[in-house]
Amino acid sequence: MCEQLARLHGCNILIIGDNDCLVNKYGHSVTIACGYDPQGMSVRILKEGGGGGGGGGGGQQLEEYPVNAKTTHLNHGHTSHVVVAGGEMLYLKFASKADCQLFRSLLQKMSGKVNSVFNLRTEDSSASQYFQFYGYLSQQQNMMQDFVRTSTYQRAIYSNSQDFHNKIVLDVGAGSGILSFFAVQAGAAKVYAVEASNMAQYAQQLVHSNNLNGKITVIAGKIEEIELPEMVDVIISEPMGYMLYNERMLETYLHGKKWLKPEGKMFPSRGDLHVAPFTDEALYMEQYNKANFWMQSEFHGVNLVSLRDAAMKEYFRQPIVDTFDIRICMAKSIRHTTNFLTADEKDLHRIQIDVEFHILETGTCHGLAFWFDVEFAGSCSQIWLSTAPTESLTHWYQVRCLLQTPIFVKQGQVLSGKVVLAANQRQSYDVEIDLKLEGTMITSCNTLDLKNPYFRYTGAPVPAPPGSNTTSPSEAYWGQLDAQGARNAVNLVNGITVNGLGEVDMSIINSNMMPMGNQPNIHPGLISSTGRQQSAQQQVTPSQQLTMNPTIACAATSTQNVAQQQLIGGAISPSLFTTPTQQIINSHHAQPIHGGQFY
């Protein structure tokens, strides 16, 4: 671990033997290494001496025991302590009274954490799963490769460098430490990077390899439980989850304000959750038809019908995580703002959003759509990070909550009600929706479990909602081709290309290359702005594909395959934006045609 709490040499581990007498478990003295663990403390048993053994020096690791606030232990004399771990009772005999007292102080400190703010609001199983998830490098990579997320944070910090120059900075939930590095690059004098998962050890490794040990101090622990040696000028963090509040990391971010100096800065400074009614018959029927599986009365001779109602309720309790065309929204979004500088963490235990939507078009309201924006209000500039469906897609996507009973609404009507986000101990929220169509008796409500969303995003371009075309798409397409053909009209004279002026075009004589437009090296099915389609001049015709070297895949196909391999949880590998596309004709004379640069 990156934070070693204690290393105690010359210890003996005794257990009860077959004859009910204490015997040395390993037959020799050992070193007890105590280190940080998200759930308490890790006790590693090492061979005495040697140079290996899992970091920090010491001998070979013989065993490791997790010790937490629920672990049974008791004092045994001045130099011994009894711990029940690994399914057996261990008698730890230390080399000195001082070592024994140090070990007991660590246990006492750990036991005091059982009543920390975080532990009181979080189930043990949820916390364990949460910290394990964020302890994986692959998950950190997923977030870091979200270009919009990472680059917006970088710009917000760089463009407000005077807020960081020679300042003390706290990075809450530092993860890999990327924001801490940005702060140092902006001139921070000192950064305390606090990370509760085992990712802290990797963050420390990055700090060391980048020669920033004097600038960045990695602290392994929860912000609710650790102590800082000084107050800070700025707090930075990336605490947002789905629908802004999921994972309840925002409460941890706000808790960190106990270390913030008066008039200190917070990056981000505020968060806006947007809520809008939407119509999407296809999505509704998709969930509805899943539940209809249980309508079968003869499934391998078994009648499933009695479970259909329970299945329907379960499917409609799932928030949908994907993206959509904003034109499916039936009214202007309602904005709920949380000012991180003034809000208290208790304000996020129950969030009520009163809504009143003035319907802009007639149709069926199938539920409510959610997205968020956050602001970085610095001294020099204000930068916004948006997850709106009109903006480039991020790993937060957007979230939609369906009504099991949709509401038919007409243009000009008012749809009112409330949305309540009730925090639970699973680090998430129960989303309660209650809507009424004003002037009628029509109502609809639903309760959804934000901890159990349905990840629906497939990478395919988002289609426009039905009925969006106001002119004939067919005529528009052929008209565009006709106009392009008129501009590029050519004639063939004895097999030689001649332009519209009657002059021989020498540019493609003795060339087997097929002229085609530059193609940016990004597949339209990846994270792109909502509803954008691949342009006509970027398509590869079947005849072009047939003439290409079969050993070299054409870009329209190969980019897609590479994308599928490099798309990790919603983030795109940077190589997709840097590797040039090549179209090669089946001829030894052919030269590659490079795709256009993507900006």
Curated annotation (Swiss-Prot):
Matches recorded under CDD domains: AdoMet_MTases
Q: Which reaction does it catalyse?
A: L-arginyl-[protein] + 2 S-adenosyl-L-methionine = N(omega),N(omega)-dimethyl-L-arginyl-[protein] + 2 S-adenosyl-L-homocysteine + 2 H(+)
Q: Which InterPro entries match?
A: Arg_MeTrfase (IPR025799), PRMT_dom (IPR055135), SAM-dependent_MTases_sf (IPR029063)
Q: Name one GO biological process term.
A: regulation of DNA-templated transcription
| E.C. number(s) listed in UniProt | 2.1.1.319
Span of domain SAM-dependent MTase PRMT-type: 127-434
The superkingdom of the source organism is Eukaryota
Q: Which residues form the signal peptide?
A: none
**Residues modified as Asymmetric dimethylarginine:** R487
State the Pfam families in the record. Answer: PrmA (PF06325), PRMT_C (PF22528)
Q: Which residues bind S-adenosyl-L-methionine?
A: Q140, R149, G173, E195, E224, T252
Q: What is its main location?
A: cytoplasm
Which function does this protein serve? Methylates (mono- and asymmetric dimethylation) the guanidino nitrogens of arginyl residues in proteins. May methylate histone H3 at 'Arg-17' and activate transcription via chromatin remodeling.
Q: Describe the protein's quaternary organization and the partners it interacts with.
A: Homodimer.
Q: Which family does it belong to?
A: Belongs to the class I-like SAM-binding methyltransferase superfamily. Protein arginine N-methyltransferase family.
Which protein are we looking at? Histone-arginine methyltransferase CARMER
Q: Which organism is it from?
A: Culex quinquefasciatus
